[in-house]
């Protein structure tokens, strides 16, 4: 996963709106454009950026292009983010244990 490309793709509110629409399932580009009140070329531009970042898949059927979320990408992203939460929680637990140990080993006890 190219984090810089992903963050750049997510930095546009309209792209985040597209992802929200795609949570419900696969949609054709034309319907995405219609729901967002955008021109087809502008919608295609944003969809291409999301595709390049690996956030969506594209499927062509006759004259239509359908898009869907790349859910495995989001699962990997959540796992990557979770590692920082674990580290923070571990540091907090270590700090609590150190305080408890120093309190219990205090000569005043």
PLM region descriptions:
Residues 12, 52-53, 66, 89, ...:
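Short amphipathic alpha-helical "recognition" segments used for binding
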Residues 1-2, 73-109:
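Amphipathic alpha-helical dimerization/coiled-coil segments
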Residues 46:
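Residues within the DNA-recognition helix of helix-turn-helix
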Residues 34, 51-52:
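Alpha-helical residues within the helix-turn-helix
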Residues 2-41, 61-73:
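N-terminal helix-turn-helix DNA-binding core of bacterial DNA-binding proteins
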Residues 32-34, 43, 95-96, 100:
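Terminal low-complexity, poorly structured segments
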């Amino acid at each position: 996963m190219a984090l810089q490309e992903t963050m750049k793709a997510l930095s546009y509110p309209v792209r985040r709106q597209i992802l929200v629409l795609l949570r419900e399932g696969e949609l054709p580009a034309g319907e995405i454009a219609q729901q967002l009140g955008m021109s087809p070329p502008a919608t295609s531009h944003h969809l291409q950026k999301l595709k390049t970042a690996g956030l969506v898949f594209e499927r062509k059927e006759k004259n239509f292009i359908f898009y869907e979320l790349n859910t495995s990408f989001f699962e990997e992203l959540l796992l990557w983010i979770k590692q920082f939460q674990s580290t923070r929680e571990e540091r907090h637990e270590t700090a609590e244990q150190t305080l408890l140990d120093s309190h219990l080993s205090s000569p005043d006890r």
